Amino acid sequence: MKIAYLIAAHTDPKHLGRLIEALNINGHTDFYVHLDKRVELNVFQTEANIRISNVTWISDRVIAKWGGYSQCRYQKALIKSCIKSGNLYDRVFFLSGLDYPIWSNCKILSYLKNHPDLEIIAGKNISETNDNLQLRKIKNYHFFRDLPISNNKLHRIIKGFVQLAMRYIPIKRKGYIVTKGKKVNIYHGSSWWCVTGGCLRYIYNELISNPVWEQFFKFAYTPGKRLHDDVLHISKKPLRGELSGFLSICQAEASCISPKVY
């Protein structure tokens, strides 16, 4: 089995090195890394101290802003690099550089071999929800989330002001997409997923050939958690929802505001 790990990194190079070493299986895994354009690549690589050769640092780098379409751009760049490599992968994971596996490689391989056709990706229909908070994320226009300013405090103020203003401005979007004569509801998911190689190629081909995706998600809230879910919902492959047990391990401590999530 061939596995590709697509990793978005922006900080903590030593942890990224540990993550890649933990997931590496000789002859089975390749790694594609996008490093935020604001970070010095050579310095980061030196500190990561990755001693294996099956790691590709992609050259198409973007400045990533949380909640902006820039997240979709680096996701697309990683997918493109993986596909254009010419390697045929059975499975492709998308991870953050701050993740770490809680399963052994043997358990990961065993699960994937036992579920060869399962696409592991979250998706909750928010087009048909009655939750106004969720509807605002897709019906309101979210401008300036990728504004190229380095002052994070100022950027947060601008985003917050625009987001508040758009609640009251009577210019709204449909909470769904129409493409190829079909209505596609918007699904809220996660930036982390694991899909088959064929599924990844379908997603990529749809993204580069159909401009409707960028037109809609460019001004949506946290589009990186929705775009790929919605592309899959127009595919011919039937999707079914399954949730077995907990998806994370949480450890709450009295001294912490938020729990640690693994």
Can you say where each PLM-predicted feature lies in the sequence?
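ER/Golgi luminal nucleotide-sugar-dependent glycosyltransferases, focusing on the catalytic module
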Residues: 1-262
